Amino acid sequence: MIHKKISIMETNINLKVDDDKYINLAKNTILRERANIQNYILDYPEFLTSYTPIKVSPDAPAIVKTMAKAGEIAAVGPMASVAGTISEFIVKNAVEYGCKNIISENGGDIALKTEKSVVVGLYAGSSPLSYTIGFKINEDKANNGYGVCTSSGTVGHSVSFGNADAIVVFAKKASIADASATSIGNFAVGAPDDAINKCLEKAEDIEYIDGVFVVMGEFAGKMGKIPQMVKTDEKIVKTSMGEYFDMI
């Protein structure tokens, strides 16, 4: 597997692919889809600013429709899924051109399609659980395409109205996982036990996600079918590629 970091404006991708010919394809995908989003925002500024689901025009680009659908499912604005959706489109386009193994991580939001199992390491800021837990995405899920997305109220620059160290959502589509992580994270308010319960209750209301893992400090909770949890360490979580994943 070839490792590559790609940075274009606000988009910072950690990419793993099985052939370097897919690197330029990924760059072109980022440029094209960013332009599609930006041009749509010029005509419909509310697409950028809305914190609630919005309808998009019938002739909107595919990525805009995907983001709007994810926002509708998770009850958030479309931009809540932008990072995961860009990763999803990078993987989708590479697979259409014959790529067998690809992992795209965009600010903690991962889309992947691989022939082997993948361990996604947990990073939850200052929580003692950071770097100690990984989630093993088995071959069946990985080979069909999968999304693992993380939202945090204590790490990074993304908007969250909650205080969770990590909301990790697992779903077939990274776009839905990303929007759902944001939506669930907004409920992480108050004492850890109460906040985690509120997050898990919200997660139960969202369709099309497999499960969620919530971290607040030393406390954690889960809902649904999350991948097998495995012990890991900083060496594995911080691979030579990036901070979040590695194939096994």
Curated annotation (Swiss-Prot):
Q: Which InterPro entries did the record assign?
A: ApbE-like_sf (IPR003374), MA1715-like (IPR037456), UPF0280 (IPR007183)
Q: Which domain of life is it from?
A: Archaea
Annotated Gene3D superfamilies: ApbE-like domains
SUPFAM superfamilies in the cross-refs: ApbE-like (SSF143631)
Q: Which family does it belong to?
A: Belongs to the UPF0280 family.
Protein name according to UniProt = UPF0280 protein Maeo_0343
Q: From what organism does this protein derive?
A: Methanococcus aeolicus (strain ATCC BAA-1280 / DSM 17508 / OCM 812 / Nankai-3)
